[in-house]
């Protein structure tokens, strides 16, 4: 609901939903401290709220819990979310570095995902991003 409200420009309503989600996620983190899903979601919410330091810390924690080196199938999911966090908070170069890497590995980014994900709106027109899209575009 926070994302939907934010997309409609209803900032105060969006913040209310995000704050409630943060409370719920923090409770889940206490209950399941080794579940990276809660950290990555928390990081994405913090990024949307402009809490950049908290966003990056939560995103990094998710990647520490389940790194690609430990799980090549699901580990990239959390690195992908971290690249979204970096993009949302305006850390373009870090986001692009991650996207370039993640577009080159199995279980990494695919064309449609990058093409449509609003998390990458801030870097969509960057030449490096466009190059990744070009390389991932399915051949017909």
Regions found by a protein language model. Name each.
Residues 1-140:
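Alpha-helical protein-protein interaction modules
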């Amino acid at each position: 609901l926070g994302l939907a409200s934010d997309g409609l420009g209803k900032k105060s309503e969006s913040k209310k939903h995000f704050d409630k989600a943060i409370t719920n996620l923090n409770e889940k983190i206490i209950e399941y401290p080794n579940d990276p899903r809660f950290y990555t979601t928390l990081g994405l919410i913090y990024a949307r709220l402009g809490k950049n330091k908290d966003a990056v810390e939560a995103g990094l924690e998710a990647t520490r819990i389940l790194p690609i080196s430990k799980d090549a199938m699901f580990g990239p999911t959390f690195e992908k979310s971290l690249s979204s966090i970096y993009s949302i908070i305006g850390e373009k170069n870090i986001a692009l570095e991650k996207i370039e890497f993640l577009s080159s590995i199995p279980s990494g980014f695919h064309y449609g995902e990058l093409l449509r994900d609003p998390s990458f709106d801030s870097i969509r027109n960057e030449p490096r991003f466009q190059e990744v899209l070009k390389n991932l575009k399915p051949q017909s």
